[in-house]
């Protein structure tokens, strides 16, 4: 009887401790680590989110930029942080999926070192665009023109956005176009080179191409998401012409593995409320992104696992070897 009583008391203490934890968190400023430098689109989104969450929780969510090494340093930092609810990571497709297949050894485990908190964006497509003087207006036109001029056209992509490189290779090989693949380390330089005709085709984020599209120097012809992007509803998806080709990105919030479930649930609720705002949804669309809401922590974790499986399959198809 005494043992049973002790066990009941222990359980009660644990329940009360969780409840107190949920009520008192956050009692001080907490960090949101961002794997890019200040001013990048990812950083702008993270700061926008942090500002909204800070106001809801009455504590500053402080953005800390840790750029470099394909986001590896930032992810390693969060993976090693104390799971106390005061360190979170604004992560993306590259950090949790593409790095997994791009590097033989990572100093963090994308599948074990993090606790999923919430989705921010589940649609972050790439876009296929062409130099405005190229005599093509649709994806079918481009496919026919490339095959008729095999080896004479090039497709540029930004290697700092891992999804773009995969998208370029997938499109080129599945359609058997024979495009010369030209990697760039700078999206700005890439877009200018396509605008000036150095390269004829590019795959980029919607936002990266916006200025040259607005200037009339580049024509967008297709989007790489599974379905049409809500921000550009008249732009066809690649899959409408080439079924099965889809390259999408995501952004999510994760925490160090072992972060208390009640804290994770609380932050998830606040992010969910924030993302419901039509103004915020419109701002995300201006970045070339879309959201269906924060989802649940469990749903976010499953989404990430599905994405990891998807990118592994793509890497195998494209014979991409980890470095």
Show where each model-derived region lies.
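Hinge/capping helix and adjacent helix->loop/strand transition within the periplasmic-binding protein
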Residues: 80-86, 101-189, 238, 243, ...
């Amino acid at each position: 009887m005494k043992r049973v009583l002790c066990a009941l008391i222990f359980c009660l203490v644990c329940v009360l401790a969780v409840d107190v934890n949920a009520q008192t968190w956050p009692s001080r400023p907490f960090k949101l680590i961002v794997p890019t430098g200040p001013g990048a689109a990812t950083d702008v989104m993270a700061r926008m989110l942090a500002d909204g969450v800070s106001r809801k929780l009455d504590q500053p969510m402080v953005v800390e930029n840790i750029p470099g090494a394909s986001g590896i340093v930032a992810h390693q930092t969060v993976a090693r942080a104390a799971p106390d609810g005061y360190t979170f990571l604004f992560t993306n497709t590259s950090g949790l999926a593409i790095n997994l297949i791009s590097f033989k050894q990572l100093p963090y485990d994308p599948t074990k070192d993090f606790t999923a908190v919430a989705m921010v964006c589940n649609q972050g497509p790439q876009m296929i665009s062409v130099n405005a003087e190229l005599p093509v207006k649709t994806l079918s036109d481009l496919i026919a023109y490339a095959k008729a001029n095999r080896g004479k056209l090039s497709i540029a992509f930004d290697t700092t956005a891992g999804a773009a490189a995969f998208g370029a290779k997938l499109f080129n090989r599945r359609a058997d176009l024979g495009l010369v693949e030209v990697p760039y380390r700078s999206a700005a330089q890439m877009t200018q080179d396509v605008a000036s005709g150095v390269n004829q085709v590019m795959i980029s984020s919607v936002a990266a191409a916006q200025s040259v599209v607005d200037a009339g120097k580049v024509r967008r012809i297709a989007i790489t998401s599974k379905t049409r992007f809500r921000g550009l509803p008249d732009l066809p998806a690649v899959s409408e012409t080439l079924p099965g080709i889809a390259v999408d990105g995501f952004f999510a919030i994760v925490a160090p593995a072992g972060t208390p479930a009640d804290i994770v649930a609380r932050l998830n609720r606040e992010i969910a409320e924030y993302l419901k705002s039509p103004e915020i949804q419109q701002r995300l669309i201006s970045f070339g992104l879309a959201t269906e809401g924060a989802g649940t922590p469990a749903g976010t974790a499953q989404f990430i696992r599905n994405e990891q499986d998807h990118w592994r399959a793509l890497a195998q198809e494209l014979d991409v070897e980890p470095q």
